[in-house]
Amino acid sequence: MSPVRPRYFTPREVSRHCVLSDLWVSYLGRVYDLTPLLEQHKGDVLLKPIIAAGGRDISHWFNPKTGDVKTHIDPQTGCLKYYTPQGRFLHIAPCFPCSGWDNDFGRPWWKDTIYQVGILSSKTRFIRIINTLTSQEQMLEVCSEETIWEILQRYLAYNAHAASYTWKFCGVPLDMDKTLQENGVQDEDLEFEELKIDADLYTPSIHLYFNDDLTEL
């Protein structure tokens, strides 16, 4: 059995999870749901920087080579310390020796994969999906790494029978197991930006043709 493919998220999706009861962050290309961590340590003042960062990318907190929190030489002690200008947070030791510091927590939360829910897209793009049966159009922001089948899963919110359609671009059926780029749907955002052309005026259109098989999902 092939391994389950991780889910990709857009920064916009991550940003929607920014409250105490539902708090996500992204860092170093991964997306994490820290809600269980907040519940476990409810009321701990060291959660404040984490809560303040809810829904955002915090890659700047970490060293991309080690995956650990950035360090610096403390000017007062001359010792190597974690660098936390946003404020000391959970599982970060105090700057000075402290008898009340409990370091028996095992793996620090930022190294615990139990909180990981997916991968942050390195590049998102907009596409227009046109239902030729109903003439309805839907603009979707998708991840460039997603296959057409995964994009279909996003579109189910607008059409529960999306799998009953043949998906085409410029009249050619799309390979549902390939990405947009692999299907020849080029991402020209960079070229448009260099030419100062509004990319929204040239959003790729995917046309759906009904197969009349009444697929139930």
UniProtKB/Swiss-Prot annotation:
Q: Keyword set for this entry? A: Cell projection, Cytoplasm, Cytoskeleton, Heme, Iron, Metal-binding
Residues covered by the Cytochrome b5 heme-binding domain? 6-72
Q: Which residues are involved in binding heme? A: H41, H72
Localization recorded for this chain is:
Cytoplasm, Cytoskeleton, Cilium axoneme
GO BP annotations, alphabetical order = cilium movement; regulation of cilium beat frequency
A GO CC term attached to the entry = cytoplasm
Is Iron given among the entry's keywords? yes
Coarsely, its chief localization is cytoplasm
Gene Ontology molecular function: metal ion binding
Say which domain of life the source belongs to. Eukaryota
Q: Which family does it belong to?
A: Belongs to the cytochrome b5 family.
State its role.
Answer: Radial spoke stalk protein that binds heme under oxidizing conditions. Required for the coordinated beating of multiple cilia maybe by functioning in a redox signaling pathway.
Question: What is the name attached to this protein's record?
Answer: Cytochrome b5 domain-containing protein 1
Species source reads Xenopus laevis (African clawed frog)
Taxonomic lineage is: Eukaryota, Metazoa, Chordata, Craniata, Vertebrata
